[in-house]
């Protein structure tokens, strides 16, 4: 299935403080990133791709177009997706990630806006985010190939033409010719190579035969 990149605008991150903001131990453990699509009509999202940078868990909310009389609502489509198996180790910290619509908790049609919620509970990393964010929708379908009518609807097996009255059966004639050819080959193989004289009978000449020549 082909895909097409959707132009988007990624807003700056908003940090939610975890801990006491009056002490040095307080640090942002949650970041929020809003993604808008100002030049695109509501679309069906197929894939989200990005490079992780020390984000341990990811949640995504989507705002979808419903109708002209109903305001669009935010719906959670991905909840606490694990990007780092152990937030305190490097595994998965800088991996490329692809998320597809079948992994989402809701239908991804008529998308207006996305909100990415990033969490990193470990105090070991000074910063975390996601980079190189790309949004994709389904591309145009490939034009269907047309085939000739004779290829789409094969002609049934042809029936042998009826025999013309008065003519011999060609199959029978072919069989008889084959037999005659085989008989000729047998005679040729068994023919003696000794030359017999025209008037020679047992090594002598017959006078009667000679008189008629």
Swiss-Prot record:
Q: Which subcellular locations apply to this protein?
A: Nucleus
Name the source's superkingdom.
Eukaryota
Q: Which InterPro entries match?
A: Nicolin-1
Q: Which UniProt keywords apply?
A: Microtubule, Nucleus
Gene Ontology cellular component list? microtubule; nucleoplasm
Kindly state the subunit structure of this protein: Part of the neuronal tubulin polyglutamylase complex which contains TPGS1, TPGS2, TTLL1, LRRC49 and NICN1.
Which protein are we looking at?
Nicolin-1
Instruction: Please report the organism this UniProt entry assigns to the protein.
Output: Canis lupus familiaris
Give the lineage. Answer: Eukaryota, Metazoa, Chordata, Craniata, Vertebrata
| Gene name of this polypeptide | NICN1
């Amino acid at each position: 299935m082909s895909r097409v990149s959707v132009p988007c605008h990624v807003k700056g991150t908003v940090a939610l403080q975890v801990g006491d903001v009056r002490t040095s131990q307080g640090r942002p453990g949650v970041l929020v990133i809003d993604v808008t699509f100002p030049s695109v009509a509501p679309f069906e999202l197929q894939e989200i791709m990005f490079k992780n940078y020390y984000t341990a868990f990811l949640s995504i909310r989507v705002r979808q177009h419903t109708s002209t009389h109903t305001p669009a609502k935010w719906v959670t489509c991905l909840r606490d997706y694990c990007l780092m198996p152990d937030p305190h180790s490097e595994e998965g910290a800088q991996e490329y990630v692809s998320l597809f619509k079948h992994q989402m908790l809701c239908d991804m049609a008529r998308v207006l806006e996305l909100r990415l919620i990033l969490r990193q509970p470990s105090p070991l990393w000074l910063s975390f985010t996601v980079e190189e964010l790309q949004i994709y929708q389904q591309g145009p379908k490939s034009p269907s190939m047309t085939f000739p009518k004779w290829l789409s609807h094969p002609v049934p097996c042809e029936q042998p033409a009826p025999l013309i009255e008065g003519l011999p059966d060609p199959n029978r004639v072919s069989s008889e010719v084959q037999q005659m050819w085989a008989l000729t080959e047998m005679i040729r193989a068994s023919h003696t190579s000794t030359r017999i004289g025209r008037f020679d009978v047992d090594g002598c000449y017959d006078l009667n035969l000679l008189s008629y020549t």
